[in-house]
Amino acid sequence: MAGHSKWANIQHRKGRQDAKRGKMFTKAAKEIIIAAKAGGDPVGNSRLRAAIAAAKAINLPKDKIENAIKKGTGELAGGDILEMAYEGYGPGGVALIVEVATDNKNRTVAEVRHILSKHGGSMGESGCVAWMFDRKGVITLEKDKYTEEQLMEVALEAGAEDVTDEGESWEVVTAAADFNAVREALEAAGVEMQSAEFTMVPQNEIEVDVETGRKLMRLVDALEDNDDVQNVHANFDLPDELLAELG
């Protein structure tokens, strides 16, 4: 599948780097705040349940999880966070979707536009590239805890599209509509998840040369360093030479 590309693997490695600098804590807390707006009880709120599971997987402290829930429900101040997605282009005509969670959309759109422009990209209108992607659910699990057969039996029975080997982990991919059912089936089977989230999978990928790939990675790094940016999705695939450098 298009989602299981060298670009996807780089995102996983970058995720671990983000965790080292604390970026993932901020992202996880914001996702909990947004999810809790629909209700503070994870039993009846599947998005909140997934957000809490993802936060625990990166060891976000319990008090921070609880405070984030209270912000989302309005029990504490600081819950005025909006989630938005900006679309645009990077070097080489690569399509980008930048998902943000912000308390000031004017500030955030200006910052995202500036970052894109500085790195050879441009902001586009809403809908300009979203049609190039499919929304999927992706559940990540530790490689050494489960066999592919174990996961296939549970996940595919619950409606998953695929179980793939991503090197250090397994990935269970679902259609957006089947995400909660698959995640709940894995939970019921006692499977521990490293992460469970929605992502935008490109329908087709653009193979870029090494220099363009370097420019794109600098752009992605700059976007992800912004405190309001939650996720960056793109439709490029990196050449093996550059992948080796980044690995």
From Swiss-Prot:
InterPro entries: Integrase-like_N (IPR017856), TACO1_YebC-like_2nd/3rd_dom (IPR048300), TACO1_YebC_N (IPR049083), Transcrip_reg_TACO1-like (IPR002876), Transcrip_reg_TACO1-like_dom3 (IPR026564), YebC-like (IPR029072). Keywords: Cytoplasm, DNA-binding, Transcription, Transcription regulation. GO terms for cellular component: cytosol. The keyword Metal-binding does not apply. Residues 1-22 are annotated as: Disordered. It is found in: Cytoplasm. One of its GO terms (biological process) is regulation of DNA-templated transcription. HAMAP family: Transcrip_reg_TACO1. This is Probable transcriptional regulatory protein Dvul_0986. It comes from Nitratidesulfovibrio vulgaris (strain DP4). The lineage of its organism: Bacteria, Pseudomonadati, Thermodesulfobacteriota, Desulfovibrionia, Desulfovibrionales.
